[in-house]
Amino acid sequence: MKTRISELVSVLNQYAKEYYQLDQPSVSDAEYDTLYRELVELETAHPELILPDSPTHRVGGKMLDGFEKYSHVYPLFSLQDAFSREELEAFDQRVRKEFPQATYICELKIDGLSISLTYEAGNLVVGATRGDGSVGENITENLKRVADVPLTLPEAVDITVRGECYMPKASFDRVNKQRQEAGEAEFVNPRNAAAGTLRQLDTGVVAQRGLATFLYQEASPSEATSQSQVLEKLDALGFVTNHEYCLAESIDDTWDFIEKIAERRDDLPYEIDGVVIKVNDLAIQEELGFTVKAPRWAVAYKFPAEEKEAEILSVDWTVGRTGVVTPTANLSPVQLAGTTVSRATLHNVDYIAEKDIRIGDTVIVYKAGDIIPAVLKVVDKYRKEQEIMPIPSHCPSCQSDLQHYEDEVALRCINPICPSQLMSKLEHFASRDAMNIAGLGSSIVEKLFGAGLVHDVADIYKLTVDDLLTLEGFKEKSANKLYQAIQTSKSNSAECLLFGLGIRHVGSKASKILVEKFGDLETLAFADQEAIASLEGLGQVIAKSLTTFFASEGAQQLLAELKEAKVNLTYLGQVVDENAALSGMTVVLTGKLERMKRNEAKAKLEALGANVAGSVSKKTNLVVAGTDAGSKLTKAQELGIEIKDEAWLESL
């Protein structure tokens, strides 16, 4: 019985690979179904014999309660965008300034959802979304229902891989036809369909929708020496990789590839929105490193956005949390990149003047970065007697005089008590990436502000249940729920609070770097500008913005009020002692460890102050080598780098 189940699992997985990955089925659907039904019957009779890679794991459904947060062991960085050949050439110049010999690999930018897959001893244990790059959602059960995601690997390896989950065009058409027949709203594009499917609580729906994947990165430490070798390894392990890539010696080569792909884009069976160009050599990648947000060794070229004509009907002016006044055009509705667009940004007053945009003009509209509708230019042939657009002289929120500084393109309201600015700051403070106060959205902020209950972020922590009950729409249950969410946020780590304060130029990544280094906001508030600027990935702009903010009397008062409200001001992540054994050292793990899992070894090294890198370079201080260590060990020996074994690591 056990042997027959094993045979069926093996042959059905092979048939599935032929069908889904190779598009070369060797048996009919009827033959597959017969074998599949036999396996189901045997597993039903003998559930103790069900194998982890059985294809029956992929079908059928169960209802999930929700998705838990998942902290990525290896962070997922976003990529710097490029929209022209000139921007690609600038990227190339930055790379070749340090590494004249660098070559590139060009891969298609799949328009889907970024995923991370983690395997232990060859078995899939976690499948997660990208989230903010540090924390995503655990969607393992749903990813198990994606036909080409391997449940087990041919080797008992510990590995974390990255890729894109997408909905092929054929699946998208089929799903939308079914939804149309059922009287349900159709998905606007394959990316939205894939995202919505992966967040389904009914796993059976995921199994039916025909999602697919392309894997492209080994996130855990790799024995490969190049990105092209990584793709070969992923292929060998049974992952689906995209073979539409090219190796390029120069930016001329990459541009040739981009132009050829652009011509074939509509004929591909899946949606793409660009081409990713990476330095192929992993050691050079390691040397180039990262900025706060993105790797310095890669860039994502985005194809020109779809453009449509629309008429500007009117213009709204709104004030953001930094006081910038932004114009937004109300348009005659147009279909653009799968959605109906009736509003588009006009950026700023300088842009309006430069393009001579007027109400009543017919303009070209596109989606900047395929996301934000924007006005590109005026269609001059339709210009009649439209008057020059009136530019506001007073803030649309508080009626204060607006400023237009010489070194800025935007109008700015500098009134520190401008209602729109204050409300926007409160919304930002409560947002998911900041203090994550569930239920405190824009409409509730507006009610709180209008009732005079809050004016700054410290006031949020002075709210009582009775205060909330005075607001329209609040009952005992909803008031208690929001109150508890506010109290819970007090225990967040300090990087959430720092980001929530909305200091100019200080994003979530920079916030974490800062509080990790200085330990708490009170220490950071008195930090020297040069000490801040010297931190990797930051610089003078962020440092000056921080020191200017904390030097103000208002900021000191705000910190005091937050502390009095018992809001945590301290970094709660792991703090490494500057005198730790490996403090400041770059360490590479290679080979197979006998007694420790690779993740455990990485965590221990980091706890000892090390920066664990994925490849050996001149910056590497130490290599920890297990058995069967390959090219990394050889390179370390050639460079004269100190080499230690697993026993040494255990002894620390």
Curated annotation (Swiss-Prot):
This is DNA ligase. Gene3D superfamilies: 5' to 3' exonuclease, C-terminal subdomain (1.10.150.20), 6.20.10.30, BRCT domain (3.40.50.10190), DNA ligase/mRNA capping enzyme (3.30.470.30), Helix hairpin bin (1.10.287.610), Nucleic acid-binding proteins (2.40.50.140). Signal peptide: none annotated. GO terms for cellular component: cytosol. The active site is at residue 109. The keyword Secreted does not apply. It comes from Streptococcus suis (strain 98HAH33). It is an enzyme of class 6 (ligase). One of its GO terms (molecular function) is DNA binding. One of its GO terms (biological process) is DNA repair. Zn(2+) binds at residues 395, 398, 413, 418. It catalyses: NAD(+) + (deoxyribonucleotide)n-3'-hydroxyl + 5'-phospho-(deoxyribonucleotide)m = (deoxyribonucleotide)n+m + AMP + beta-nicotinamide D-nucleotide. Its cofactor is Mg(2+); Mn(2+). InterPro entries: BRCT_dom, BRCT_dom_sf, DisA/LigA_HHH, DNA_ligase, DNA_ligase_AS, DNA_ligase_CS, DNAligase_adenylation, DNAligase_N. DNA ligase that catalyzes the formation of phosphodiester linkages between 5'-phosphoryl and 3'-hydroxyl groups in double-stranded DNA using NAD as a coenzyme and as the energy source for the reaction. It is essential for DNA replication and repair of damaged DNA.
